[in-house]
Amino acid sequence: EMTSSLVGSEMCIRDSYRTDNHGKGSWYSINGNIDYQRTSRKNKERMITLSYKINSQPQTNDSYNTYLDIEPDENKLDIIKELSLKNFHSDGKTNTMEQTFQVDYTTPIGKLHTIETGAKYIFRRNSSDNRFYEAEGASENYAYNENRSSEYRHLNHILSAYAGYTLKYKGFTFKPGLRYEQTIQEVKYLVGPGENFDSNFSDLVPSVSLGIKLGKTQNLRGGYNMRIWRPGIWNLNPYFDDQNPMFISQGNPDLKSEKSHAFDVAYSSFSAKFNVNVSLRHSFNNNGIERISRLITAEDGEDFGGGHIAPHGALYSTYDNIGKNRNTGLSLYLNWNASPKTRIYVNGRGSYTDMKSEAQGLHNYGWNGSFYGGIQHTLPLKLRLSLNGGGSTPYISLQGKGSGYQYYGLS
């Protein structure tokens, strides 16, 4: 509860009122899963696994904001009108429900080969119903306000299937794989701003890895993988938001999934005295989702269809797959057990980043590095003394550089 007062020019209280906020809400999480696995009697490494999982998170929120004791009483109606004092009541319900069905099958072929395959289906439903009611200050005659209310349904159908093959021969391992993913989205806005739309994404995601044992304590591995990021609802929604007619925004339902490609090579060596891991990684993305803005220069404005016209001089913003990003990095981890009671460790990383946004006319690149390390020593009575420190150079962003840091500690 809060009290507000308005002071006049003669430093006396002109009017005052109290604000009362109260409400109640609930939050639940419901989880469950069932798994079934069957192993072949002839070969224990041949198996099939069936899985089902469900998760639901219903929430409710019922809140009131009320103006009380509006004084002076003889000016109550004028005060309510001048200060736009409106009691409001918000009654909201949301729920996220997800069900996952999955099957996995693994079988060896001879002594050297293994095949893995499987499929997964995810059904995800997000729903929200938030009703907003208003009344003039000091009144309880609440009226439904559709403009400030919202109700929507987001349905996601995610289907994926994968196949993988593994070859193991002495110290050599070769493992290629391929995954197919399809996402179907259905978005409906029953109340409030927003435009109904559907989207469909289909992606093939390959991967491959190689591993070689160089003796009993050394390994060399390399590989390639691709990761995908799908655009969010706000990126896709074609709703023409011209609440401010000079600053217009609209999603792009034709966006594609972002695809990031990564190659890496790593060497590791482990022994009682030394542990070493060195890795080199290069990644790039040629279709990053970027927000693009442009001025409407046509004297008569620009027609975007559906009766939507952006006036001359307005700033129109949407999204497109035009971002580019490249990064090459080298990392090192070293652990040396100098004595039974002393351990020295070092962890460092250096990378070169190149980022470009054609829509914004921005291009930035540069080096970045980070390091931390320390010494640990065990004292008598099993007390442990630790000295550590580290730092980082400024990181590279599209519009400049961030801040670096350094630290040290003794414990």
List PLM regions with ranges:
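Single conserved hydrophobic/aromatic residue that forms the stacking wall/gate
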Residues: M2-G8, C12-I13
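Extracellular loop and loop/strand-boundary signature of outer-membrane beta-barrel proteins
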Residues: D15-H22, D35-Q37, S84-D91, Y144-E151, ...
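Face-selective signature of the C-terminal outer-membrane beta-barrel domain
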Residues: N21-K188, N277-V278, R326-S351
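Outer-membrane beta-barrel proteins
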Residues: G25, N43-E45, P58-S63, N126-N130, ...
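Residues that define the transmembrane beta-barrel architecture of outer-membrane proteins
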Residues: S26-I30, N95-Q99, L155-L159, N200-L204, ...
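Structural signature of Gram-negative outer-membrane beta-barrels, strongest in the C-terminal barrel
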Residues: G92-Q102, T106-S127, Y144-N275, S279-N285, ...
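Outer membrane beta-barrel strand-and-loop segments of large Gram-negative receptors
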Residues: E98-Q102, A143-S150, Q250-N252, K256, ...
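Conserved C-terminal beta-signal and adjacent last beta-strands/turns
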Residues: N364-S411
